[in-house]
Regions:
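N-terminal Rossmann-like dinucleotide/flavin-binding domain of flavoprotein oxidoreductases
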Residues: 1-65, 145-162
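Rossmann-like dinucleotide-binding cores of NAD(P)H-dependent redox enzymes
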Residues: 16-17, 105-108, 115-171, 251-255
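Conserved beta-strand segments of alpha/beta enzyme cores
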Residues: 31-33, 84, 130, 162-163, ...
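Conserved SAM/SAH-binding loop
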Residues: 35-38, 53-54, 166-170, 174, ...
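Short hydrophobic core segments
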Residues: 61-71, 111, 187-195, 259
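Glycine-rich dinucleotide-binding loop and its adjacent helix/turn
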Residues: 68-127, 162, 218
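Helix N-cap at the beta1-alpha1 junction of Rossmann-like dinucleotide-binding domains, i.e.
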Residues: 74, 138-140, 198
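FAD-site-proximal beta/loop scaffold in flavoenzymes
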Residues: 83-104, 176-178, 183-265
């Protein structure tokens, strides 16, 4: 829902937060520790080392089963001028973009035509900002069949979005974006949405198997290569049910279901 806060469809920032530490404790009796980081995992002793950044203290927690849900970070390519581009991953990110949008930029360029790129373009146009989407692939929304993606592209064009497909970005300057094709696009606002990179630092330290796509490989029960460590969310690779190939699907819907599956398995329920 983050892009829709930028467009004003979601009016209140609080509506972006489905839960808070207080609400999770009240509803589920969960002990949620914010400003707290797990810095290492000892899979043999079944312990994690925890750093409390507010108190400056470090301590250990033991576990029977461990669930990793470290998420992912935006991919930022080494393009000259890339520091001008804003990414969209957190509430803090969306605040920055909303502030820039409220300053009424005359033009915007969105780098990336995936789900986030298409949604942010939709909302920029909704705010009356002429918007261009640049996508290296020959279509937007790569997971879709070309026939379906072409319908999305047609609708985007009808709504005023300019598309540059099968093209990339070579440089970003103070007011323009130059493409590999040589085209120069006016860009008061630049948003980068070309995907995410799984966060697997702890997993690697714990000796968990990492797949070719960079995620933690899990089975149908969300178990990693260590039977006592589960993983869910944007940092996992799963077997595609249709193709049988490993897939990385950093979307909220699958992450939600994965969390429920892992919880059911650990609780002894038939998931």
């Amino acid at each position: 829902g983050l892009p829709y806060f930028v467009g004003g469809v979601i009016e209140e920032e609080d509506a972006l937060l489905l839960q808070t530490p207080a609400s999770l404790h009240a509803r589920f009796k969960l002990d949620v520790r914010i400003a707290t980081e797990v810095t290492s995992i000892d899979p043999t002793a079944k312990k994690v080392t925890v750093k409390d950044w507010q108190k400056g203290e470090e301590y250990e927690l033991s576990y029977d089963k461990l669930i990793l849900s470290p998420g992912a970070s935006p991919v930022v390519p080494p393009i000259p001028g890339i520091e001008r581009a804003l990414t969209l991953r957190t509430v803090e990110d969306v605040e920055k973009i909303a502030n820039r949008v409220n300053a009424k930029p005359k033009t915007a360029v969105v780098i990336g035509g995936g789900f986030i790129g298409v949604e942010i373009a939709e909302n920029l146009v909704h705010k009356g900002i002429p918007t261009t989407v640049v996508e290296a692939a020959p279509q937007v929304l790569a997971p879709l069949d070309p026939e379906m993606a072409s319908l999305v592209a047609k609708e985007m064009a009808l709504q005023g979005v300019e598309l540059h497909l099968a093209d990339g970005v070579s440089t970003i300057d103070s007011t323009t974006v130059t493409l590999t094709s040589g085209a120069v696009l006016p860009a008061d606002l630049v948003i980068l949405a070309i995907g995410v990179r799984p966060e697997t630092t702890l997993a690697k330290m714990a000796g968990i198997e990492i797949g070719e796509r960079g995620g933690m490989r899990v089975d149908e029960n969300m178990r990693t290569s260590n039977p006592d460590i589960f993983a869910v969310g944007d940092a996992v690779e799963i077997k595609d049910f249709i193709t049988g190939e490993w897939a990385l699907i950093p979307l909220a819907g699958p992450a939600n279901r994965q969390g429920r599956i892992a919880a059911d398995v650990i609780a002894g329920r038939d998931s």
